[in-house]
Swiss-Prot record:
One Pfam family named in its UniProt record: Sec7
GO molecular function, one term: guanyl-nucleotide exchange factor activity
Organism: Mus musculus (Mouse)
UniProt subcellular location: Cell membrane
Name this polypeptide is given: Cytohesin-4
Length: 393
C-alpha cells in the first residue's frame, strides 16, 4: 500500500498551522509519557529501597532480640534492660510478663531467677506472670504442671514462698469454692510437690503410700479435712506421671534438680595443678552438684554431703572461702565423683573441697544452706509454718 506524503508547500496556511500543532502535541505527549515512565521507575526504585531497608531493619531487630535473649539467659535483669533500651520491650510489667510467659528462646532457670527477685518491679512482674495462667476447671495437679513448666522454681525458701503464694491466690481466684482459703491451696501444693519427690526421686527408698498423704493433709482446709476422693485423684495423678520441667533445665536429672536448696556461681579449687575454676553449683537432696555452664544437662561433679561438715577457712589467694571436709576421717579422700576430659565418670581425689564465694554474705548463706541440707528435708519449714497458721485461725 502506497503512503502518500503531503508536501508542506502544497498545504494552505491554515493546514500548515494545524499540522504544526499536531506535531507539538505529539512531542508533548511523548515527553509526558517519558516523565511518567521516569516517575514509575523512581517509584519502583523507592519500593525496592524501602523493602531492602525494611528487611535490613527487621534483620537488625531480630539480631537485637537474639542478643537480648542471650543476655537474659546469662543475667535476667540486664537482659530485660537491654530489650527495653532497644525498644523491643516496654517497661510495662504486663509486657514483660507476657514476654516471660511466651518464653521464646528463654532459659527457664533465668525466668525463675527474674521472677524470684524481691525488687518491686520483679514482684509486680511475678503477679502479672501468674495472672497469664488460666487455671479454671483444672485440678490442683494439672494447674501445678502448667505453672511449674513455665519456669524453673528457684531454690531459696523465700522465693519459693512468694511464688507459691501467688500461685495459690491465682488458682483460688480461677476456681472459687474448691478450697476454703488460699492457705489450703498453698499447703496442698507443697504436699503434692513433696509427694512427687517421694514417689519419683531415685534417692528416696521409702515411697509414701496414699494413707500417709491423707494424714499429712489432715485439717488443712480451715481446720477441716479435704474430701478423700479429691486427695486420691491428686495422688494417682502424681503417681502415674511425675512433674516435669523443660529439657534445657533438667534433662534426665529433672527429679534431682527440681527444687534445689540453693544454686549459684562459685569458684572451686581443683585439678592436678591447683587452679580456681568458676562453676555453677546446685545444692539439693543432700548433694552438691557443680556444672561448667548453667545450661549443662549433666554435672561435672557430684559431692554427697553425708558425713561431711562445712566451715569457713582463710585462703592466701582467695577471699570468702568455705571448706567441705570429713571431720572423722581427716586425710582420707571424700567419696565423690566427677567427669574427666573424655566424658568418663571417675572417683574424686579430694581430701577436702575448697570453694570461694563472691562476698562474705554469700559464703555464709552457702554454709548455712549446706548445713541445713545435711540435717533436714527441703520444704518442711515452709509447710510447717503455714500449717501452724491454719490451725491458729
Amino acid at each position: 500500500m502506497d503512503v502518500c506524503h503531503t508536501d508542506p508547500a502544497e498545504l494552505s496556511s491554515g493546514e500548515a498551522k494545524e499540522l504544526q500543532q499536531i506535531k507539538w502535541h505529539r512531542k508533548q505527549l511523548l515527553e509526558d509519557i517519558q516523565k511518567l515512565k521516569d516517575e514509575i521507575a523512581d517509584v519502583f526504585a523507592q519500593i525496592d529501597c524501602f523493602e531492602s531497608t525494611e528487611e535490613s531493619r527487621m534483620a537488625q531487630k531480630e539480631k537485637e532480640m537474639c542478643i537480648g535473649r542471650k543476655k537474659f539467659n546469662m543475667d535476667p535483669n540486664k537482659g530485660i534492660q537491654y530489650l527495653i533500651e532497644h525498644k523491643l520491650l516496654t517497661s510495662d510489667v504486663q509486657d514483660i510478663a507476657q514476654f516471660l510467659y511466651k518464653g521464646d528462646g528463654l532459659n527457664k532457670t533465668a525466668i525463675g531467677t527474674y521472677l524470684g527477685e524481691k525488687d518491686p518491679i520483679n514482684l509486680q512482674v511475678l503477679q502479672a506472670f501468674v495472672d497469664c495462667h488460666e487455671f479454671a476447671n483444672l485440678n490442683l495437679v494439672q494447674a501445678l504442671r502448667q505453672f511449674l513448666w513455665s519456669f524453673r522454681l528457684p531454690g531459696e525458701a523465700q522465693k519459693i514462698d512468694r511464688m507459691m503464694e501467688a500461685f495459690a491466690a491465682r488458682y483460688c481466684l480461677c476456681n472459687p469454692g474448691v478450697f476454703r482459703s488460699t492457705d489450703t491451696c498453698y499447703v496442698l501444693s507443697f504436699s503434692v510437690i513433696m509427694l512427687n519427690t517421694g514417689l519419683h526421686n531415685p534417692n528416696v527408698r521409702d515411697r509414701p503410700p496414699f494413707e500417709r498423704f491423707v494424714t499429712m493433709n489432715r485439717g488443712i482446709n480451715s481446720g477441716s479435712d479435704l474430701p478423700e476422693e479429691q486427695l486420691r485423684n491428686l495422688f494417682d495423678s502424681i503417681k502415674s506421671e511425675p512433674f516435669s520441667i523443660p529439657e534445657d533445665d533438667g534433662g534426665d536429672l529433672t527429679h534431682t534438680f527440681f527444687n534445689p536448696d540453693r544454686e549459684g556461681w562459685l569458684l572451686k579449687l581443683g585439678g592436678r595443678v591447683k587452679t580456681w575454676k568458676r562453676r555453677w553449683f546446685i545444692l539439693t537432696d543432700n548433694c552438691l552438684y557443680y556444672f561448667e555452664f548453667t545450661t549443662d544437662k549433666e554435672p561435672r561433679g557430684i559431692i554427697p554431703l553425708e558425713n561431711l561438715s562445712v566451715q569457713k577457712v582463710e585462703d592466701p589467694k582467695k577471699p570468702f572461702c568455705l571448706e567441705l571436709y570429713n571431720p572423722s576421717c581427716r586425710g582420707q579422700k571424700i567419696k565423690a565423683c566427677k567427669t574427666d576430659g573424655d566424658g568418663k565418670v571417675v572417683e574424686g581425689k579430694h581430701e577436702s573441697y575448697r570453694i570461694s564465694a563472691a562476698n562474705a554474705e554469700e559464703r555464709d548463706q552457702w554454709i548455712e544452706a549446706i548445713r541445713a541440707s545435711i540435717t533436714r528435708v527441703p520444704f518442711y519449714d515452709l509447710l510447717s509454718a503455714r500449717k501452724k497458721k491454719i490451725v491458729g485461725k
